[in-house]
């Protein structure tokens, strides 16, 4: 397998990934089910490695931290400690430090989002009104579409792609190694969107079975999203992700 050493700025760090999982799974941040969140976290890190992204060491440190917390919570208590109120009062929740960091990070992220929205409001005050997108918006609003699809949402969708390929296709006896330019895949996706002139299901882009093609397709979508050539939408947690070309939106 060829190595695509690509660092994606959209990955903001392990706390950001944990917050995404907490929101996606509708978990109480003050009572995190460590076993469940650890399993999901490790799955995302594994997917990043499948994509051969430049996974920062801090993600691996957090993985080790989660496994440590999980182990501490699974350790059997001494029988005498179960009836010793003083020991119970002194005992700390292994999750306490992590929960504190998550709460602080969420405050920081919310504040950053508020500042960003204020800046956008100021910019809009001195620009011409946007084009009328009411026709395009009707369908999206009716479905309560979420237009803020994150990179982690895309990783979750890519996990489904990998699982589906493993289930429906036998493992190849021989893998043909070939270099696939990301630019070619980006052009292929944009040409498809221009031809259809409608939104495309993210999953349908992954027609090939070779890992090289799957990885490059995912990276091509990321690059198109970063360069604002496409927009992604999702109708809710665990729902399919759809891709819309920016040209389609502007022509609506």
From Swiss-Prot:
Keywords: Cell cycle, Cell division, Chromosome partition, Cytoplasm. GO terms for cellular component: cytoplasm. InterPro entries: ScpA, ScpA-like_C. The keyword Acetylation does not apply. PANTHER family: SEGREGATION AND CONDENSATION PROTEIN A (PTHR33969:SF2). Belongs to the ScpA family. NCBIfam families: PRK00104.1-3, PRK00104.1-4. This is Segregation and condensation protein A.
């Amino acid at each position: 397998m060829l190595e695509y050493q690509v660092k994606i700025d959209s990955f903001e760090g392990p706390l950001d990934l944990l917050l995404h999982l907490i929101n996606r799974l509708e978990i109480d941040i003050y009572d995190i089910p460590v076993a469940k969140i650890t399993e999901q976290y490790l799955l995302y890190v594994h997917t990043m490695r499948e994509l051969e992204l430049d996974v920062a060491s801090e993600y691996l440190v957090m993985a080790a931290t989660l496994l440590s917390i999980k182990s501490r919570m699974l350790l059997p208590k001494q029988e005498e400690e179960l009836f010793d109120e003083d020991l119970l009062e002194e005992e700390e929740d292994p999750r306490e430090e992590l929960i504190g960091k998550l709460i602080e990070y969420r405050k920081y992220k919310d504040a950053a989002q508020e500042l960003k929205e204020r800046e956008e409001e100021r910019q809009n005050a001195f620009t011409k009104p946007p084009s009328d997108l009411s026709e395009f918006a009707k369908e999206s609003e009716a479905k309560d579409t979420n237009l803020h699809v994150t990179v982690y949402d895309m990783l979750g969708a890519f996990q489904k792609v990998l699982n589906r390929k493993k289930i429906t296709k036998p493992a190849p006896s021989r893998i043909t190694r070939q270099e696939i330019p990301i630019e070619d895949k980006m052009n292929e996706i944009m040409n498809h969107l221009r031809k259809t002139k409608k939104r495309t299901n993210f999953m349908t882009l992954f027609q090939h079975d070779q890992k090289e093609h799957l990885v490059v397709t995912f990276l091509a979508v990321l690059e198109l999203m970063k360069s604002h050539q496409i927009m992604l939408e999702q109708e809710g947690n665990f729902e399919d992700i759809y891709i819309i070309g920016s040209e389609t939106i502007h022509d609506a």
